[in-house]
Amino acid sequence: MMSRLKRWLAVVSVAFVAGCGSGDDPVNVLETARNNQYTILGEAVTAAGLTATLSGPGPFTVFAPTDAAFAALLAELGITKAQLLADSALLTKVLTYHVVLGEVKKASVPLGTAITTVQGGVLRVDSSAGALVITDERGRTATITSTDIQASNGVIHGIDRVILPRGTVVEMAQANPVFSTLVEALVAADLTSTLSGSGPFTVFAPTNEAFAALLTELGLTKAELLANKPLLTDVLRYHVLSSRVGSSAVPLGLPITPLQAGFFKVSATPSGLVITDGRNRTAKIVTADVNATNGVIHVIDRVILPANLDIVQTAAANPDFSLLVEAVTAADLGAILSQPGPFTVFAPTNAAFVALLTELGTTKEALFANRELLTQVLTYHVVAGNVLKAAVPTGTAVATLAGPTQTLTVSPSLVITDQRGRTANIVATDVLTRNGVIHVIDRVILPN
């Protein structure tokens, strides 16, 4: 790394001399920089402790930001020049990102392809309306405003914006204005330090529009949301995984556990990857695989929320499960099914219970009064664990909470066969709750 820096700084030194247009022997790079459009670049080189390495054969290509470009960077990052110059590690990383090995003149710049820098990151140059435009690793762009400034050991191209290498997930969000509300939220929840750590993390990052929609949905102002630190922390942590998971590695249809308690799932649809959150709301991944130094970002169009209801509460909120809820209450199973679990419940509809009463030739009152039978029947509808549709075992006996011998079988077409040879169709799947998942069935299944 230092050998590359030594050779690069020699190029910068010559660049400043070339900018003076003098035929005299070159003067010190810092003296030249004082009256040159690359003054702040010269200060940055000095502040980074790199001036002693101004030698080396090269050749190199340097993309040199103007003073105006540095001023714009300070405004973008919300820091002063003194703060920037005090951070030698950041300066070294940024400065070496502006250098490419080899002499690449304007006519030879490879367009539309990744160009590796001395820093190790990549940038891309494209032709746009007759100009050459650089796109950095944060998706920011800079225009090449002057080209082919010849130096003894390379060439310099002036640019109108400081380009930045890939940063942490927080830095990547800070560099993109569409995440300004997300950044405010991370600051308010004191999560910036966590997400600036080594990670790795996967962040499902909601846009400003996604946050605006959430405020409308919850009936809150932004100030009220940012002031509610417990809620904000829970919501933000629900968007973060403790590992790097690229879009091609996302486990489709399976429970995904974030930093926050709970889970969500991701499904592949014709329009792309879609998240179903704990409240059964959906968010689309609109941009995937924005790589950061400590993880990866997937941009989403809706803020996802952890579940606020358990299995019993979710069933109680749906009028089509009113008989099921009555049965659970009569069997005194509510406390069990409200525990952390997780549980998978095959939930019969009201119509399924009515059909059972006819089949058994009994009344609801008589069935619900037989607590022992009711408990056996209801626990036969419960399987331990979060078994989403994609993971339902087919063609094999599945143990239930009714007992190790009280098993059921599910076919590939999602038809359950109970121990009496009766069948029930799974008519709706993957209703997520705080402590498990519900699959809706059209018939009450029965154990032996």
Q: Where is each model-derived feature located?
A:
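Mature, structured domains of secreted/extracytosolic soluble proteins
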Residues: 20-448
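Bacterial N-terminal signal peptides that target proteins for export
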Residues: 1-9
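Bacterial N-terminal signal peptides
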Residues: 10-18
